[in-house]
Amino acid sequence: MSKEVSEEGKTHHGKDYVDPPPAPLLDMGELKSWSFYRALIAEFIATLLFLYVTVATVIGHKKQTGPCDGVGLLGIAWAFGGMIFVLVYCTAGISGGHINPAVTFGLFLARKVSLVRALGYMIAQCLGAICGVGFVKAFMKTPYNTLGGGANTVADGYSKGTALGAEIIGTFVLVYTVFSATDPKRSARDSHIPVLAPLPIGFAVFMVHLATIPITGTGINPARSFGAAVIYNNEKAWDDQWIFWVGPFLGALAAAAYHQYILRASAIKALGSFRSNATN
């Protein structure tokens, strides 16, 4: 997209931002870089902290018996959204602040990260999630074991198809927000206000939780669902686990395609470039 400025009868064409080059599909050189392993550590710790705070909030809420006790659904949604805001702000400059395999998958499809980095991030995120929920169980063992362990399952009264649809749409909202908040044009314009990228991402997580907690407990993050399932180790949590991988990955795929090929018209630009080269 070009920026046109007319001044004194002259028209100047030029971008006020630079599109980063696409990441290589397979960059084995990253395995020799300390910055790659530093990013893996950042993703591991961020996901650990995310799961610890959020699952502890869920268990603490369920532990209360009075109708006005605990933080309620609104407080749980704030815990998830608020932690994403904080952790993305803290880690964006190191790893990009993904904290979610679905986000990593979407960015990989858009050629923002290489396959090596994407796989490394997903492994680090899942391990961090397991450790984070493990800390919750260690500190709150009795309520953790009796109150669902913070695991994602399909709620009574909802079909698996409905739950899958909720996860697809919820993850679409999140990943679409990530693409929009980190768009090079927006980043160039808002670079003097560093909180403007993490804020809408955290708020998107908050809003999606309000909508989907009654259906699935809100996954939209395969690492979050996997970590809780591993530590809680409940049959229903494992039976429903596929929903919290397939749904988020399909949602991320749809968001990446929508942003890259419709909003940013990457396919049309590539076709135009091909035609231009063919005529020269």
UniProtKB/Swiss-Prot annotation:
**Hey, which stretches end up on the Cytoplasmic side?**
1-38, 91-118, 182-192, 264-280
Please give the residue positions where the record annotates the modification N6,N6-dimethyllysine: K3
Q: Which GO terms describe its cellular component?
A: plasma membrane; plasmodesma; vacuole
Recorded hits in InterPro entries, A to Z, give: Aquaporin-like, Aquaporin_transptr, MIP, MIP_CS
Enumerate the UniProt keywords alphabetically. Answer: Acetylation, Cell membrane, Membrane, Methylation, Phosphoprotein, Repeat, Transmembrane, Transmembrane helix, Transport
Its tissue distribution reads: Highly expressed in flowers, expressed at low levels in siliques, and at low level in leaves and roots. Highly levels in elongating cells in both roots and shoots.
Expression is induced as follows: By NaCl and abscisic acid (ABA) treatments.
State the membrane topology.
Multi-pass membrane protein
Q: Does the keyword tRNA processing apply?
A: no
Q: Which residues carry this modification: Phosphoserine?
A: S273, S276
The PTM N-acetylmethionine maps to M1
Spans traversing the lipid bilayer: 39-59, 70-90, 119-139, 161-181, 193-213, 243-263
The entry lists its GO molecular-function terms as:
mRNA binding; water channel activity
In the record, Phosphothreonine modifications are located at: T279
Motif NPA 2 per record, residues? 221-223
Q: Which stretches of this protein does UniProt put in the Extracellular compartment?
A: 60-69, 140-160, 214-242
Motif NPA 1 is found at 100-102
What does the record's free text say on domains? Aquaporins contain two tandem repeats each containing three membrane-spanning domains and a pore-forming loop with the signature motif Asn-Pro-Ala (NPA).
> Which family is this protein grouped under?
Belongs to the MIP/aquaporin (TC 1.A.8) family. PIP (TC 1.A.8.11) subfamily.
Quaternary structure and interacting proteins, as annotated:
Interacts with SYP61 and SYP121 in trafficking vesicles and at the plasma membrane.
Q: What does this protein do?
A: Water channel required to facilitate the transport of water across cell membrane. May be involved in the osmoregulation in plants under high osmotic stress such as under a high salt condition.
This protein is called what? Answer: Aquaporin PIP2-7
Q: Which organism is it from?
A: Arabidopsis thaliana (Mouse-ear cress)
